[in-house]
């Protein structure tokens, strides 16, 4: 008799995706982050669902409804802080996942990669709208500043901003629609994730060496299920430590005050995971130029396959490219720090230099160094 997991229509799909999936035998722990993102997404949907049961999307009661969740709902404080810090874990996993894709040349699977970039945009949009919901000072002013950037679009900009706001400023209509979108987007992200996996399973996983691994595959279960479980354990411990010991560590103190349209905070900034893009936006004095640079800092990922000039796929055996990659990582950390600083000397100059270096490394230096390595290897 055939095993039910191989004959049942639904079980068969799960079996081919997570159990009998042929996987390269040499993939490292950097490949754990895909499954970690799946766990983060499930965690965010579950905690978000429970929060939505008690939250009210109204400017007069939003802030107090969040306070009510923390004070009066059973384990409401835990659900709220797991959701807030879970977003931070989500972005850490997301950035490592993208970084691994760049380092090992996973972007050569163009369909999977482009789907991933769309997913990145969707998660960023969801996180931004989620940050507005508690209706604290930084929620309100962050929403005002970021949505106002769209007014830089020629001709239709102002109308577009007012259309998004549902009025002439960020108000009740804005909060209501942001809540609606924040609720529905994670389910759209789940559907996009299925498509992302579908494309990945068409080609099979990449591996650290970057060479074809068809001759050396092992089943996903039990080898990689146990390895993924170890990753879950690590992330779970870090998340729980953060939630139970310093839940507000990554938040902004200004958000502990209710939104006040009459009082502008001295330094408006988004959540830490958007600071690198925010620093790039601020480094250009022109409003439209800044918005374009902000969008390009993420869109640039789509053209990664076109910038690949090396004869080798992975950076594993390319020390010069490795150096550039880690300079890029350091540069992104610098941009994150700059984004959290006020707009004054010397932060402005450091931000401008770092932004310029970011685009220079990706668009010019990486392709050039790859060509040099080809020459040195006489390829």
UniProtKB/Swiss-Prot annotation:
Cofactor note: Binds 2 heme b groups non-covalently.
Binding residue positions for a ubiquinone: 201
Entry similarity comment: Belongs to the cytochrome b family.
Membrane-spanning ranges: 33-53, 77-98, 113-133, 178-198, 226-246, 288-308, 320-340, 347-367
CDD domains reported in the protein's UniProt record: cytochrome_b_C, Cytochrome_b_N
Cofactor(s) named in the record: heme b
Short name of any one Pfam family annotated for the protein: Cytochrome_B
Keyword match Signal: no
Protein name: Cytochrome b
Binding partners and assembly: The cytochrome bc1 complex contains 11 subunits: 3 respiratory subunits (MT-CYB, CYC1 and UQCRFS1), 2 core proteins (UQCRC1 and UQCRC2) and 6 low-molecular weight proteins (UQCRH/QCR6, UQCRB/QCR7, UQCRQ/QCR8, UQCR10/QCR9, UQCR11/QCR10 and a cleavage product of UQCRFS1). This cytochrome bc1 complex then forms a dimer.
GO terms, biological process: mitochondrial electron transport, ubiquinol to cytochrome c
Mode of membrane association: Multi-pass membrane protein
Localisation per UniProt entry: Mitochondrion inner membrane
Keywords: Electron transport, Heme, Iron, Membrane, Metal-binding, Mitochondrion, Mitochondrion inner membrane, Respiratory chain, Transmembrane, Transmembrane helix, Transport, Ubiquinone
Organism, scientific name: Fukomys damarensis (Damaraland mole rat)
Residues the entry annotates as binding heme b b566: 97, 196
Main location: mitochondrion
InterPro entries: Cyt_b/b6_C, Cyt_b/b6_C_sf, Cyt_b/b6_N, Cytb/b6-like_sf, Cytochrome_b, Cytochrome_b_C_euk/bac, Cytochrome_b_N_euk/bac, Di-haem_cyt_TM
Anything else known: Heme 1 (or BL or b562) is low-potential and absorbs at about 562 nm, and heme 2 (or BH or b566) is high-potential and absorbs at about 566 nm.
A GO cellular-component term linked to this record: respiratory chain complex III
Entry's Gene Ontology molecular function annotations: metal ion binding; ubiquinol-cytochrome-c reductase activity
Entry binding sites for heme b b562: 83, 182
Functional summary from the UniProt entry: Component of the ubiquinol-cytochrome c reductase complex (complex III or cytochrome b-c1 complex) that is part of the mitochondrial respiratory chain. The b-c1 complex mediates electron transfer from ubiquinol to cytochrome c. Contributes to the generation of a proton gradient across the mitochondrial membrane that is then used for ATP synthesis.
């Amino acid at each position: 008799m055939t095993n039910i997991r191989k004959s049942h229509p639904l079980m068969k799909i799960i079996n081919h995706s997570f159990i009998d999936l042929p996987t390269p035998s040499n993939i490292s722990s950097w490949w754990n982050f895909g499954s970690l993102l799946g766990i983060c997404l499930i965690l965010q949907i579950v905690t978000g669902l429970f929060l939505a049961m008690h939250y009210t999307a109204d400017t007069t009661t939003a802030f107090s409804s969040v306070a009510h969740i923390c004070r009066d709902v059973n384990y409401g404080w835990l659900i709220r802080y797991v959701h807030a810090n879970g977003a931070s874990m989500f972005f850490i996993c997301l950035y490592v996942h993208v970084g691994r894709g760049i380092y090992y040349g996973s972007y050569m699977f163009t369909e999977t990669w482009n789907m991933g970039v769309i997913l990145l945009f969707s998660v960023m949009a969801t996180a931004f709208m989620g940050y507005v919901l508690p209706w604290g000072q930084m929620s309100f002013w962050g929403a005002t500043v970021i949505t106002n950037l769209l007014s830089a679009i020629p001709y239709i900009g102002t109308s577009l901003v007012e259309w998004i706001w549902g009025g002439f400023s960020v108000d009740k209509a804005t909060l209501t629609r942001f809540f609606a979108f924040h609720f529905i987007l994670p389910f759209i992200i789940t559907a996009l994730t299925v498509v992302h996996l579908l494309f990945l399973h068409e080609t099979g996983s990449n591996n650290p060496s970057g060479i074809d691994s068809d001759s050396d595959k092992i089943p996903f279960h039990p080898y990689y299920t146990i390895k993924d479980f170890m990753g879950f354990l690590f992330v779970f411990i870090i998340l729980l430590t953060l939630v139970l010991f310093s839940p507000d560590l990554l938040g902004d103190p200004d958000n502990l005050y209710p939104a006040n349209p009459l009082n502008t905070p001295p330094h408006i900034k988004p959540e830490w995971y958007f600071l690198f893009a925010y620093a790039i936006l601020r480094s250009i004095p022109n409003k439209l130029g800044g918005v374009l640079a902000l969008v390009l800092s993420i869109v640039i990922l789509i053209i990664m396959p076109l910038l690949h000039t090396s004869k080798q796929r992975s950076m594993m055996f390319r020390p010069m490219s490795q150096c550039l990659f880690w300079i890029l990582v350091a540069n992104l950390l610098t941009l994150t720090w700059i984004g959290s600083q006020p707009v004054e000397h010397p932060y402005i100059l450091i931000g401008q230099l770092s932004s310029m270096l970011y685009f220079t490394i990706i668009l010019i230096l990486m392709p050039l160094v790859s060509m040099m390595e080809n020459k040195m290897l006489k390829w």
